[in-house]
Amino acid sequence: MLFRSKVRTLLGKNVKTRSCTLIDQVMIDLSPDIFSQCINSHVDLSEVNHLVFTHSHSDHLNTTEICFRLREMASVIQKKDKKVMEIYGNDAVQDGIMEIIAKDPHVDLTRMRFHRIQKFEPFRIGHLKFTPLKAYHKLDEEALIFVIEDGRSTLLYANDTGALPEETLDFIEQQNIKFDVVSMDTSRGILDGDTHMGIRENVELREKLRRMHAVTPDTEYYLNHYSHMCGMIPQEYERLVGQEGFLLTYDGLSVTV
């Protein structure tokens, strides 16, 4: 209750909804809070036809909104844009979507195309190249993080994972990947990491990437997937991680690389 009271008083960047990311017109994960996020950040979801999922946890896989997009209630969008909704994810993501769709007689499956993705097998969406990597998270499925490239810059999108598995680090080193931006999970805050990272694991990952020459002195480091487990509100945690040279993300943050 103390955290909630502080947030209600201070508002601003302290108000944190559940994470998802828009890169150009590709959405990574679909938050249960997507409606308010789009209103607050002035995002037009009718322009988004590609969804890429990291895993099937409900704070990332919002099946209800997917169904809305595939139903007649989205007829205005369909008249405006006849493109099929392209969805990328693992088997568990596909199963989660199909389970909900099976209960909705109004869904038009011709409006959706699912692409099964696997670790270390790159795929392209327009000018963006995605390379899925193995995450340490939701251990009953192949949870993923991503290397994302646009031909000019390279992002490590490592949100919702604990310390990266050795096979993921080995792949990064063997492929000689250089990151311009690194975005890391920081759900655990000052606590020890588990299937999420905290600040200790954030520092350790940065050092591993440095030793592998996968980053440069100009690489920017963002901490994302912040939660109440951090033990402090965002502006307090922001000061702490800032001492380590990290930037804490917030709702509506826009990064240009």
Predicted regions span which residues?
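Active-site flanking residues adjacent to catalytic metal/cofactor-binding acidic residues
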Residues: 28, 54, 157-159, 184, ...
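Metallo-beta-lactamase
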Residues: 80-143, 246-251
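Core dinuclear metal-dependent hydrolase active-site scaffold
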Residues: 1-43, 114-170, 253-257
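Short, well-ordered amphipathic alpha-helices
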Residues: 35-39, 64-72, 97-102, 200-210
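Cap/insert and terminal regions of metallo-dependent hydrolase folds
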Residues: 162-253
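Alpha-helix termini
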Residues: 42-43, 70-81, 103-109, 174-176, ...
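Active-site metal-binding motif and surrounding structural segment of the metallo-beta-lactamase
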Residues: 31-86, 177-182
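Structural motif
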Residues: 26, 50, 153-157, 181, ...
